[in-house]
Amino acid sequence: MSSTSHRVGEGDTLLLDGPASLRITSGRASILGCTLKPNKSYLMRPHRRYPAYAETDFHAEVRLGEGAGAKIIKGDSIGEDWRDVANRLQNGSTVAVMGGSDTGKTAFATLVANTLCKRYGGTAILCLDPGQSYLSPPSTIAAALLREPTYDLAQAKAFTTLPVGSTSASQDEEAYLRAVQRLMEHVRKTGAANIVADLDGWVEGGEAETLKERLVQIIKPSHLISIDCTIERVVEAVMGWGGVVNLVKRPSHILERSSGVRREIRSMSYSRYLKNASVRTIPLGWVDMEVLSESLPEYPTLLNNVKPDAGLLTYLAGEDEAQYHIGVTTKYDRGRRVVKIYTAMAGPVKRIAFGRVLLTVEGDEVGYL
């Protein structure tokens, strides 16, 4: 990584596109409400943009990786309406952040979570986008408890990870909603006073609108934050139980990502969760099995799709039924009723779920069932 020094004036913003690292050498800066500690190095993930806002003049050392970038802009990169909405939230809030792709949903969720953490001591975070999950592998949704502000929600550790079986809610709406329902049940059991739900980005068309209405019926947010997006039936539902709806603008400096880049991000994530994996032979008679999609055939027929170069993305759980790990089913022996699964999961396997993504052991998506 090349290293450069930057001076940022009070009230301005240093925009960093990862992969990069940032170290504040003097002054005070924050990212989405998280104050950065001096002389600590913060790692920025690839294909993500991080706004380091100058609360005072600050100097920083920046290291940039391949394809990364850094630039200083005048003023605050996030709108005044964002900070105003976040600052008006009270203890006991359940916040749902809604918007299309590349509108800043996760950035807003980070700002809200950090604001609630600083004021009230913590919040639960739900990442409900199975295509761009930052708490868990692609094709899953997850929840984490945040005890202190963070510059990147991916730093939080998920206490619940549940499989959806596909990388978009549009590919299997019922499987997605069932997973969200289960996730909310686990989150409510924690007794978290504040909840922030970062929704998926499918918002256009009648089916998307219906899904979002059903989604908020499950979450029951006290506050709906809608970024450059208005779905009347969702607004009416939230207001129907006394919820507050805030419409905010999409910031002008959001990083836009193509479908190819999103696919690359998923591939890197699969690889990370399959790191140090090995092949495990699992007798199917020893585990509970589930096919996540009602539109897919039962497992004996489904597993016939497994090929040497295209395994089936599989989800495994042990004693904790709320924490699933991913694997790739690489072989099915019908006669012996065993499967070979490439996975990093350690310990006994009690449950296996099958989705619809065909995946190589290197983490490349090669098709969908």
Please tell me what each predicted stretch does:
Residues 1-93, 97, 111, 141, ...:
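Preference for solvent-exposed, low-hydrophobicity sequence contexts
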Residues 76-98, 120, 124-195, 203:
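Nucleotide-state-sensitive switch-loop elements of NTP-binding domains
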Residues 93-118:
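Glycine-rich phosphate-binding P-loop
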Residues 107-108, 135-140, 208-209, 236-238:
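Short acidic, glycine/serine/threonine-rich loops at helix termini
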Residues 108-111, 179-183, 211:
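Well-ordered alpha-helical segments embedded in enzymatic catalytic cores
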Residues 115-119, 190, 218:
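Alpha-helix C-cap/termination motif
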Residues 186-187, 193-243:
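Phosphate/Mg2+-binding loops and adjacent switch elements
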